[in-house]
């Protein structure tokens, strides 16, 4: 696995570069990406936004927001006791895909969560995308216990029609 530098993204330039990677990696238009102002607000309110760098070039990113473990029918539980991260999106420039950067970003996200005392990270992925399945289950050891049909609704870009 090739080593790249991974560090938090904190500047408006970082957020704009993240948007460009989002569009390139997922084949999206600007309207279908997370705006830089939203990334800035999320990053300053408990979200974890990390970037992978090859030298000075941002080549990939991962975003996770704070959430709570679902406890249907139990609104009396204190949220702090149910904290988790929800890994929202990861994007890697096509020229750098397949080099283990996704694994490195996910592991860095895990380390950041553990430093905060958060012991659970959840995310969604399409089980028919074999590369994602290999990463999530094969490499990261994720446990799948739920399937949501059409979780994100109609999608654009690379995921259109899935």
Over which residues does each language-model region extend?
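A conserved beta-strand-loop-helix scaffold within acyl/acetyltransferase catalytic domains
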Residues: 4-94, 126, 148
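Conserved catalytic-core motifs of GNAT/GCN5-like acyltransferases
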Residues: 69, 124, 138-158
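Conserved acetyl-CoA pyrophosphate-binding loop and the N-cap/start of the following alpha-helix
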Residues: 96, 100-108
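Conserved GNAT acetyl-CoA-binding A-motif
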Residues: 113-126
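Conserved acidic functional residues
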Residues: 126-127, 133
């Amino acid at each position: 696995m090739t080593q790249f530098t991974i560090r938090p993204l904190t500047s408006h330039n970082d957020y704009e570069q993240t948007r460009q990677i989002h569009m390139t990696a997922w084949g999206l238009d600007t309207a279908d990406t997370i705006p830089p102002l939203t990334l800035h607000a999320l990053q300053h309110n408990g979200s974890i936004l990390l970037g992978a760098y090859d030298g000075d070039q941002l080549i990939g990113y991962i975003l996770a927001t704070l959430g709570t473990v679902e406890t249907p029918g139990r609104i009396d539980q204190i949220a702090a006791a149910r904290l988790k991260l929800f890994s929202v999106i990861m994007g890697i420039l096509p020229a750098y895909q397949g080099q283990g950067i996704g694994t490195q970003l996910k592991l860095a996200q895990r380390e950041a969560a553990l430093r905060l005392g958060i012991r659970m990270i959840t995310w969604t992925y399409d089980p028919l995308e074999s590369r994602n399945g290999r990463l999530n289950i094969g490499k990261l050891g994720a446990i799948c216990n739920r399937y949501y049909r059409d979780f994100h609704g109609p999608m654009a870009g690379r995921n259109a029609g899935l």
